[in-house]
Regions:
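Compact, glycine-rich, soluble single-domain proteins
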Residues: 2-126
Length: 126
């Protein structure tokens, strides 16, 4: 059975697993259905990222047609987001999909507000 690793994210988009939404506030009050969906900002864990922003490859235009060096038409400027980061993003820009029974969101990098990344060296020092 295919998993998330089989999904290919294109362009400047990221695939996010949203955090679980609670129907209860921190004070114990239960919220009516739909209240959480009206919030402007949501958080989640980044599962996959696209290759980045496409830019023209000058070597493709300037090179000789028979040359075998770097013949890709475009290059990609990589994204800041990395798999495993926690992200806060604009909910209105998210596209919700369901893949194998799991709710996922596809979001452009420009809609990410904050990234939280754990320092891998910090874990080694503990």
């Amino acid at each position: 059975m295919a998993g998330i690793r089989d999904i290919i994210v294109v362009g400047d988009r990221v695939l996010i697993r949203p955090e679980e939404e609670s129907d209860q506030t921190s004070h114990g009050l239960y919220l009516p259905a739909g209240v959480r969906s009206k919030e402007k900002v949501q958080g989640g864990t980044i599962m996959k990222v696209g290759p980045g922003y496409p830019v023209p490859n000058p070597a493709y235009m300037d090179g000789e047609p028979w040359s075998t060096e770097d013949r890709e038409m475009v290059k990609y400027v990589p994204l800041q987001a990395q798999p495993g980061d926690y992200a806060l993003f604009l909910r209105e820009k998210a596209i919700e999909i369901e893949y194998q029974g799991e709710k996922l969101l596809i979001i452009p990098q420009s809609s990410l507000l904050v990234l939280v990344r754990k320092d891998p060296l910090e874990e080694l020092q503990e």
